[in-house]
């Protein structure tokens, strides 16, 4: 805090982040959300990359904070009654020690093995956690320009994250292309959610501190059954899901990098006057 008070300005990436600093007596704090590349992430026509499958996308580096354990638990139950369900994911994590935090979850067992060339073996891990072979696809580390292609193949996206300091760029990109998105209603995600642009996860409990995260105030534990309920709703009512996806894209329409950088530079200009 002593060092923070010495800065002329602190810029945060979410309202939650800003409020934490203000609650600790820092008054020189402003908020600027990150932007989206709208030349790539915009409402696009659904492709048929995975025909005859109900495809669910999950993105973000594998770790307890990102709650892929919740995705796995919910998908396992959903796929048991919908054999055509397919989980596609981009969970690459360049920080193995952070990835190991997923073992903190009681919903899954073990962690993926990492080869000598630092490749993560998701297949055996997911199968050992009850996902049938052929029910999931690891997208690896696709280039950002390739992501709209994969998102356009999905019927839904799931982000049950326990905490987001910012606003979760992958979730923003999924919403911007018009996907029906299941989104945990906590921390930075709250800046993305309105009454009708997603399927919010509101049934949440407190998170207990765990290494290396000693402070988890504001974090929230999502409810697996609520994720499952939303997946069933999207599966059954595709018209409403499409409408929510369209409203999601509209709500993210102003989050262009041009707009966000202009706002950022405005604060810097004010500081220099």
What is the predicted function of each stretch?
Residues 100-145:
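Nucleotide-activated donor-binding/catalytic signature segment of Leloir-type glycosyltransferases, i.e.
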Residues 16, 35:
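Carbohydrate-associated surface elements
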Residues 180-183, 197-202:
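Short hydrophobic beta-strand element within catalytic cores of glycosyltransferases
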Residues 149-166, 179:
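Acidic donor-binding loop of glycosyltransferase active sites
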Residues 226-229, 233, 240-254:
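A short, well-ordered alpha-helix in the C-terminal region of glycosyltransferases
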Residues 36-52:
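Acidic anion/phosphate-binding donor-loop and adjacent secondary structure
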Residues 257-273:
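C-terminal alpha-helical cap of glycosyltransferases
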Residues 49-66, 72-76, 87-89:
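Conserved donor-binding/catalytic core segment of Leloir-type glycosyltransferases
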């Amino acid at each position: 805090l002593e060092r923070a008070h010495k800065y002329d300005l602190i810029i945060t990436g979410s309202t939650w982040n800003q409020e934490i600093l203000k609650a600790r007596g820092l008054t020189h704090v402003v908020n600027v959300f990150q932007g989206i590349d709208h030349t790539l992430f915009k409402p696009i026509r659904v492709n048929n990359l995975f025909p005859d499958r109900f495809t669910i996308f999950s993105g973000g580096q594998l770790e307890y904070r990102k709650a892929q354990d919740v995705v796995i638990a919910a998908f396992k139950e959903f796929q048991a009654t919908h054999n055509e369900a397919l989980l596609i994911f981009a969970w690459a994590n360049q920080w193995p020690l952070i990835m190991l935090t997923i073992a903190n979850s009681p919903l899954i067992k073990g962690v993926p093995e990492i080869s000598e060339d630092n490749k993560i073996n998701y297949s055996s891990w997911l199968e050992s956690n009850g996902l049938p072979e052929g029910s999931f696809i690891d997208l690896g580390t696709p280039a950002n320009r390739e992501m709209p292609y994969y998102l356009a193949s999905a019927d839904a996206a799931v982000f049950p994250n326990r905490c987001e300091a910012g606003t979760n760029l992958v979730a923003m990109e999924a919403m911007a292309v018009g996907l029906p998105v299941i989104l945990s209603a906590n921390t930075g995600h709250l800046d993305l959610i309105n009454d009708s642009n997603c399927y919010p996860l509101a049934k949440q409990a407190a998170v207990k501190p765990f290494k290396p995260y000693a402070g988890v105030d504001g974090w929230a534990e999502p409810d697996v059954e609520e994720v499952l309920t939303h997946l069933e709703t999207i599966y059954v009512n595709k018209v409403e899901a499409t409408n929510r996806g369209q409203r999601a894209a509209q709500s993210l329409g102003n989050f262009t990098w041009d707009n966000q950088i202009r706002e950022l530079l405005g604060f810097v200009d004010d500081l220099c006057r």
